[in-house]
Amino acid sequence: PVQQPAALRELISIQPGRVVSMALSRSEHCQMTLLAFGDGESISEERYFGDTVYYVLEGDMPLRLEGHEVRLGAGDCLAVPAQTTHAIGGPWPSGLVWG
């Protein structure tokens, strides 16, 4: 959304059996992606060069962070430091902003 404000939940929809993504920003200074997870979908363990912030728009989102699980709900936000191994996704449909 560049010209006018937009409700993030209306930009992307949860689809069964898929992880759907939409880039909101991909500049060298800021990368932000909107993600929608179908039931049981996830993104495997990763390490990113910069800090990563997750904000859950809807549903519940388990985040596995260096061996332990944190459950984020709608409205929750969590920052993961750079080079920290983590994975996101779980058995429920959910949507989040990642950047």
Give the positions of each predicted feature.
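A short, N-terminal "cap"/entry segment at the start of jelly-roll beta-barrel domains
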Residues: 1-29
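Conserved short histidine dyad/triad with adjacent acidic residue
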Residues: 17-18, 31-48
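Structural motif
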Residues: 31, 60-62, 69, 85, ...
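Short, conserved beta-strand element in jelly-roll/cupin
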Residues: 36-38, 47-63
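Short acidic-glycine-tyrosine-enriched beta hairpin
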Residues: 67-83
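Ligand-binding loop in jelly-roll beta-barrel domains
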Residues: 82-99
